[in-house]
C-alpha cells in the first residue's frame, strides 16, 4: 500500500441500554467479550486502524449511553459522524421498537439527509436460545425496506461468539468512507502548515 493521508472516520453506535453496543465494539477492536454488564456513562470511544480499498482508515467508534437521561448530550456526540450504527437485542422486542426513535433522534440532532446518510441496523445476541427470540429477521428486514430510498443495511450478529462482527465493521468502514468522500474534501488538505504564531502586520492606527 502506497503512503497516503490517513483518513479519520467517526462512527456513532446507538441503541437501548443493554443491547450489547460496548460488547460489539470490544469484540471488534480488542477481540474480547465480557459477560459482565457495565452501563456506559455519557459516551466513550475506541479506535481501530483498518484498510479500505487500499486506504488507511482510523475508525473512531463512539459508544453512547442508552439511558434517556443522557440523550440530551446527543448533539455533541453525533456531530461529525460519518456513519450511524443502531443496535437492538433480537430477544427484546422493545429494543427493536426503539430503533426508529434512535434514527429520528440522530437525524434531528445532525440535520443529515435521511436518504443519503448511511445507517446500519444490527440485531445482536443471536447466540441465545432461538425459542426466546422476539424479533424475527423478516420483521427487521421489513422495517428496513419500509424506509424507501434510505441508505440502510441490516446485520445480525453475536458479540459473544464473534458472529458477523468483522463483516459488520468492514461494511461500516466502507459506508463511512464513501460518505466522507462524498463531502467537500477541504479538511486537513493544506500544502503547507498554517503558522498560527506568526504576528500579523498591523497597518491600522486604531488603538481600540
UniProtKB/Swiss-Prot annotation:
InterPro entries per the UniProt record, alphabetical: P-loop_NTPase, Small_GTP-bd, Small_GTPase
Annotated positions of the Cysteine methyl ester modification: 208
Molecular functions (GO terms): GTP binding; GTPase activity
SUPFAM superfamilies assigned: P-loop containing nucleoside triphosphate hydrolases
Keywords noted in UniProt: GTP-binding, Lipoprotein, Membrane, Methylation, Nucleotide-binding, Prenylation, Protein transport, Transport, Vacuole
Lipid attachment residues per UniProt (S-geranylgeranyl cysteine): 206, 208
Residue positions binding GTP: 17-23, 33-40, 66, 124-127, 158-160
Superkingdom of origin: Eukaryota
Disrupted gene: phenotype observed: Contains large vacuoles.
Coiled-coil intervals: none
Subcellular location(s) of the protein: Vacuole membrane
GO annotation (BP), single: endocytosis
Activity regulation, short description: Rab activation is generally mediated by a guanine exchange factor (GEF), while inactivation through hydrolysis of bound GTP is catalyzed by a GTPase activating protein (GAP).
Keyword Protein transport: yes
Pfam families in alphabetical order: Ras
One GO cellular component term noted in the UniProt record for this chain: vacuole
Keyword Lipid biosynthesis: no
Record motif Effector region, residues: 37-45
Gene3D superfamilies in UniProt: P-loop containing nucleotide triphosphate hydrolases
CDD domains on file: Rab7
NCBIfam families from the UniProt entry: small_GTP (TIGR00231)
Family: Belongs to the small GTPase superfamily. Rab family.
Function: Ypt/Rab-type GTPases are key regulators of membrane trafficking and intracellular vesicular transport. They act as molecular switches that convert between GTP-bound and GDP-bound states, and regulate virtually all steps of membrane traffic from the formation of the transport vesicle at the donor membrane to its fusion at the target membrane. In the GDP-bound state, Ypt proteins are predominantly cytosolic, solubilized through the interaction with a GDP dissociation inhibitor (GDI).
Protein name (record): Ypt/Rab-type GTPase ypt71
Source species of the chain: Schizosaccharomyces pombe (strain 972 / ATCC 24843)
